[in-house]
Curated annotation (Swiss-Prot):
GO biological process: tRNA 5'-leader removal
Enzyme Commission (EC) number: 3.1.26.5
Matches recorded under SUPFAM superfamilies: Rnp2-like (SSF160350)
Any GO CC annotation of this UniProt entry: cytoplasm
Domain of life, source organism: Archaea
Organism this protein belongs to: Pyrococcus furiosus (strain ATCC 43587 / DSM 3638 / JCM 8422 / Vc1)
Enzyme class: hydrolase
Complex and partners: Consists of a catalytic RNA component and at least 4-5 protein subunits. Forms a subcomplex with Rnp3 which stimulates the catalytic RNA.
GO molecular function: ribonuclease P activity
Family membership noted in the UniProt record: Belongs to the eukaryotic/archaeal RNase P protein component 2 family.
Gene name tied to this protein: rnp2
Reaction(s) the record says it catalyses: Endonucleolytic cleavage of RNA, removing 5'-extranucleotides from tRNA precursor
Protein name: Ribonuclease P protein component 2
Localization annotation: Cytoplasm
């Protein structure tokens, strides 16, 4: 009786981009601290509506190399990058987020920007 709703074809889905980044700081941070810092930075610079449109989402974060991947909407990549560059501290500790690059797939992002940090 309860039928599953039809999924959207790939041509109608939102296009995504993946951003590789590295946290530069004297301290080590965990995934939750980075997620909160990214979210707060986007809310501060883009506002609630802009953040909702950009859809920033932390996909993966490696705590040993302090590198990670963020997914966002294709049309708002530079808005998210702008927000990340304005991060100056995380939980009261001085830190900056350096964007390594942008790609359309996670596989290509790892191969191109994160392979030097041991990502496979």
């Amino acid at each position: 009786m309860s039928e599953r709703p039809k999924t959207l074809p790939p041509t109608l889905r939102d296009k995504k981009r993946y951003i590789a980044f590295k946290v530069i700081s004297e301290n080590q941070f965990n995934k939750d601290e980075i997620k909160e810092a990214i979210w707060n930075a986007c809310l501060r610079t883009l506002g609630e509506l802009g953040t909702a449109k950009a859809k920033p989402w932390l996909i993966k974060f490696d705590e040993t190399t302090q590198t990670g991947i963020i997914r966002c909407d294709r049309n708002h990549v530079y808005d998210v990058i702008f927000s990340l560059t304005l991060v100056s501290d995380i939980n009261g500790n001085k830190a900056i987020i350096k964007v390594l690059g942008v790609s359309g797939t996670i596989k290509r992002l790892k191969r191109k920007f994160l392979s030097q940090f041991g990502w496979r």
